């Protein structure tokens, strides 16, 4: 696990665009909405839209390089766990990308309509859930060599979008925050198990 964490953090630090590109995209989209001078409720919606687009862009390259250079296949052939690999990728993105995105959203919106701690936590859970689902779409696209296969995750996102709207636009934390947390747990387990299953056909007999 430690080795995987060091690898993923090093990959992000050694390629600075992995940090500044998503944060720049997020900030630019957010700035556009601010210039358009929407009211506060639409600012929360713009925060979600900016997050949605940014996480989607990140997910497009999450596994691409490791898949193309054979790193994932090598791990499978060596019998090394993909769970620690997936966990390390999530922790590195959470620490270096999603936490700064949450800070930017907090500084701009302020989450003034409710408790800051709960809204900050909900925002991180929202970003993490998007991360898992978009990664599933990215993995399906790589495995089948067809980006349209990623559309399969859209039905899974519909209930999630409704939950996010009720939390950040309607400001209804209870019981939606609990539902959002349950959706996060579902996405983390279901998606990671699916990713491991998707990778299994690439095994080769030594």
Predicted regions mapped to residue ranges:
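Selective transmembrane-helix segments that form parts of the transport pathway or gating/packing helices
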Residues: 82-109, 184
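Hydrophobic alpha-helical transmembrane segments of multi-pass membrane transport/permease proteins
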Residues: 15-37, 45-56, 98, 151-163, ...
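Aromatic- and glycine-rich beta-strand/loop motifs that create alpha-glucan
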Residues: 1-22
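A structural motif at transmembrane helix-loop-helix junctions in multipass membrane proteins
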Residues: 122-157
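Helix-loop-helix units of permease transmembrane domains in multi-pass membrane transporters
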Residues: 62-94
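Single conserved hydrophobic/aromatic residue that forms the stacking wall/gate
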Residues: 196-206
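Secretory targeting signals
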Residues: 97, 101-129
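Transmembrane alpha-helical segments of integral membrane proteins
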Residues: 134-135, 159-169
